[in-house]
């Protein structure tokens, strides 16, 4: 049966690969690069980049004329507008092109062509310019756009290089543009958005010489605020320190697949940069020109927070703890639902569609976060809330033993019935984590045993209530009466419920569900959400279908990293035009940590390890893992006898196992 599934999958993969288009290449530096001369033009794209007080969606293109164009959409999450709701961040678009104001020998600079575009924590273009259309290029301009790591500011660095065989005089004008919003529209009155050029003047450049100037786009309160005098080059150094230090020095993936390695690195960037400093503390926000200074039970509690301990990014861990504590404030004696979202810098909430299974999302995410974080202090703060959420879910059980909820994270976009598979699976995983946490929190053996018994009963109920033949596949109905395949049928596989793994993956990877952009939300629709595709990939690895999962993960990574919309996982289509929401990047990283490497936390310093290495790989490693309060590495190597040799190195000490593929080992870090 598994061979038949693999054969059918191969046909689907071949068809999908034929429709994919690679536009980018991976450079030795780790950046991705676009050569406009090597692709069909015009080409256009958008990318989001963020810092603690700003986010920028850069919409850029290389036209059929090979000219580079850029528009910046600036978002300032802590500058709130009225109505101060989910979407109440100050926003302003800036399309100013400063280069036509620059001159060479008193003649206007004219762009001739684009040589290269690259992305590596910043958006960089290299363009050629002269003083007349069609004339020989005289200068090469490198323009780099990036967000400040700490300030409400987006920055640009321009470097102009003389590529002519003669001396030139470069003239850069003074430039300042400001916009003042209406006081009646701002929570704190009027706001000023100001763009400034630094480095104006005349520069004599011999052949091969370069000169640089910079621009900044910032915002501040008109009353009581003032513009910052920017040091753009220092801001660039800080941005690169974040990329090279916080991101590149931890959780380093090595596999034979360079595309997956690179996309994992880029996903680490997006998952970690989208954290905003607000009056409510550090708050991760999905982004997408919509979701800032706010958290959700799915995007943050469920998707991205459990990832941060592995990276060891202190800002991420702080935002995760703050997120859970904010929701903990809403536990109540009546066991009414917690809000789905905490918005407006933590000052308001949103629960517009009722209970989405939010407490189940928290139990899954917080349980895994606390175990992987390895901090007793944090666990003591959150354990009462975790127990409350578990009890809330228990009280929602229907007569068949699965939890009720009004809807799910898709919020009525697609039907979810009165009880859905997503809420049930998340609650199940929360119970498993609680059984591990309980003794660490001083609970009795009976308490831990109770959580395990509840998990066992729920697992059985999931099989009996949701297990079904849908469309000819032995898989799951997403809700009672559902007769169309749904993407979220992948969830049981992520949490060790693999009774129907083969039929489920055959359904998900069939041509009825799988597309070049991932898995359809529902059979027969045109809608896809990356989040369920990423869960499915994690589940496929976890269930032992590593070869099938690898092909799909490679295709997905190639599409997102090197295709026509790069370089991060996206939210959805057609909704949102494939915005780079950052929670999905956290889910990509968890495909690796929890799927490929099969890490399942079991204590503050222990985990189960189930290496799910594809058969065509001879080895792989994950280095400098910062979870459990340690810095350790995992390496897996296939031996001549068909076994897998595992090395776990921590604190200068190495432990080795030799296992059969599919076996699980229990690791305790000492």
Task: Please provide the spans of the model-predicted regions.
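Proline-centered turn/helix-capping motifs that create local helix->coil transitions or kinks
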Residues: 275-278, 331-336, 394-404, 464-471, ...
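Active-site core of glycosidic bond-cleaving carbohydrate-active enzymes
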Residues: 296-321, 325, 380, 384-387, ...
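Terminal accessory carbohydrate-recognition/targeting modules of carbohydrate-active enzymes
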Residues: 18-262, 545-549, 557, 599-670
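Amphipathic, well-ordered alpha-helical segments in soluble domains
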Residues: 91-100, 299, 323, 358-365, ...
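The feature captures the catalytic groove of carbohydrate-active enzymes
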Residues: 204-233, 284, 288-294, 339-361, ...
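Bacterial Sec-dependent N-terminal signal peptides
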Residues: 1-21
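Short amphipathic alpha-helical coiled-coil/interface segments
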Residues: 264, 268-271, 448-466, 556
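Substrate-binding groove/exosite segments of carbohydrate-active enzymes
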Residues: 244-380, 388, 407-409, 484-494, ...
